[in-house]
Amino acid sequence: NTRNDMERNAGRPFLVWGYVTLLTTLLVWGTVVQTGEPRWNLLWLLIPLLGGTLTYFTRGKRTEGRVHTFVDRVLGSVWLVAGLTASFLSLVALFTPIRLPILFVILLTMGMGTAATGLILRFRPAACCGAAAILLAPGMLIVHNDWQPALFAAGFLAMMIVPGHILN
């Protein structure tokens, strides 16, 4: 069942979240650099809003009697943990005085989720692209703050958009 779903529509969530994150990153980066106003960082909240909405509207038709396998549940759990972790830490970074290297944390977390998905499904492109994002993440601790969004966008391009297009 999971293999059939993988062949039919597993690329959609990768593409939705990859493109939403990439475009939001470019929007936030451009507005903050152009205006010098950090309040534009609130645009990061577009990611869960647009990503969740598009995921809902682009999901496949629900078939009656569809069996949810153990692998389906494991993948759901992997992404639930990754998503809740990313959401919680993003809210901490946006709305508290605690300073986190949030782009590093999010890229690392999502890279681990993508790599785990690839390993669980034995889909090598997702495993390798997730690993590439994990390896890219520490670079954001090294580069100047102005260039961190570029690495973040590149990481999402590699870990979500590339495997998503390979699947579709």
How would you name each of these model-derived features?
Residues 116-168:
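Terminal transmembrane helical module of multi-pass membrane proteins
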Residues 27-33, 90-96, 114-121, 137-145:
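Hydrophobic alpha-helical transmembrane segments
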Residues 53-71, 112-119, 161-168:
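C-terminal ends of transmembrane helices
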